[in-house]
């Protein structure tokens, strides 16, 4: 999906903003790593096996003359553009029919990379509660807020179903 127009570029992406209060922030790119693309011989280098049976590629950076070894069983830190996460399909189990709902895989990558286990995730525009649900599934604490009562109801229902009989301390507050 995305905006189409004859007078501008088609808008086919979302932008994720990454903010930190200080220069000391949590980032674990390998926790959100993606499978390495081995490419072709010309782009990825020759795949070899080391003395322990692990597959790797050596890559030469021509500008510096340095070689780097990348093991294929280790995840690669993703770039800042992702094409490996698909939109939510109409028959998907995670779909809650909320108009701005994002795929859980997208939020999982962001949360794993930017919040430690037992850390706190805050979604100021929680919508359907996807961010909060993914935080819960990945052992992070969470806070959510939304001005839209429908969003609060949708997110609360989703989290309640996910939690079922757990003793969690889930509270919903109306501040209007």
Stretch-by-stretch model annotation:
Residues 164-176:
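Extracellular/periplasmic ectodomains of large secreted or surface enzymes and adhesion receptors
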Residues 1-166:
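Core catalytic lobe of class I
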């Amino acid at each position: 999906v995305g905006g189409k127009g004859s007078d501008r570029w088609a808008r086919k992406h979302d932008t994720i903003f990454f903010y930190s209060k200080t220069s000391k922030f949590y980032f674990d790119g390998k926790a959100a790593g993606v499978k390495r693309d081995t490419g072709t011989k010309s782009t990825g280098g020759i795949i070899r096996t080391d003395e322990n049976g692990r597959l790797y590629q050596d890559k030469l950076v021509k500008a510096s003359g340095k070689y780097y070894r990348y093991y294929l069983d280790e995840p690669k830190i993703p770039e800042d553009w992702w094409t490996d996460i698909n939109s939510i399909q109409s028959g998907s189990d995670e779909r809650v029919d909320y108009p701005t709902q994002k795929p859980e895989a997208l939020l999982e990558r962001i949360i794993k990379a930017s919040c430690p286990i037992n850390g706190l995730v805050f979604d100021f525009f929680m919508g359907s509660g996807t961010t909060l649900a993914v935080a819960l599934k990945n052992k992070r604490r969470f806070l959510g807020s939304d001005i839209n009562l429908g969003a609060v109801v949708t997110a609360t229902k989703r989290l309640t179903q996910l939690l079922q009989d757990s003793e969690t301390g889930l509270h919903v507050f109306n501040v209007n």
